[in-house]
Amino acid sequence: MAATILYPGRNWLTIDGEVVVINTLDEEIDGKSNPNDPSGVDNASKTGLTWAKYLGTGPTYYADMWNANANTIMFRYAETLLSFAEAKNELDGPCDSVYVALNKIRFRAGMPSVDKGKYSTKETLRELIRRERTVELAGEGFRRADILRWKDNNGKVLAETVLNGELKRYVGTVNYDETVPEKRAVISEDTELVEKRVFVSHNRYLPIPQEYIDLNSKLVQNPGY
């Protein structure tokens, strides 16, 4: 998670070369308004969590937002391996080529190989592949398409479950006396509602912009819009 998410209490090296502690929990810090407090500003993460993935640290990255030296990833070999593993498992069930594909990704991240005994059926391996895909490709634009094509054991599209419900954020404070970043956030049992999300079946498709319908009378708007 630390390679993917910026969380409260984590150390971060700014473009000025200063090490700061991420704090999206406290409304005030040392008597001053916290610019990263989700409840007090519009340009901060509403959940208190944000992406660390692909962000370079220190003064050599993003010093000029129009001339950054961070390389944009256009194609991910890991996504190819995950797609192969998913398709192969659905076609033939567990086999060596599926495990090999998954292990290439896991070994790169310093993770152990897949436990073949634990993931020995098409169903259990499917769940593992979905989890690996969720973790590996987090924040890269694949998630919506994945949960629109994946179904649960009852044949229900996962998006109808995952995208319906309340989105909440943690409540608490950051303990600056704690030296271990993972232990700095003191989380309350309470949570705050960010928004209530609603997903219905027609949301599977996006609306056609009205300007294009105006240009072509034969275009028919997608249902529900």
Spell out what each predicted region is.
Residues 2-225:
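Acidic/polar-rich alpha-helix caps and helix-coil junctions
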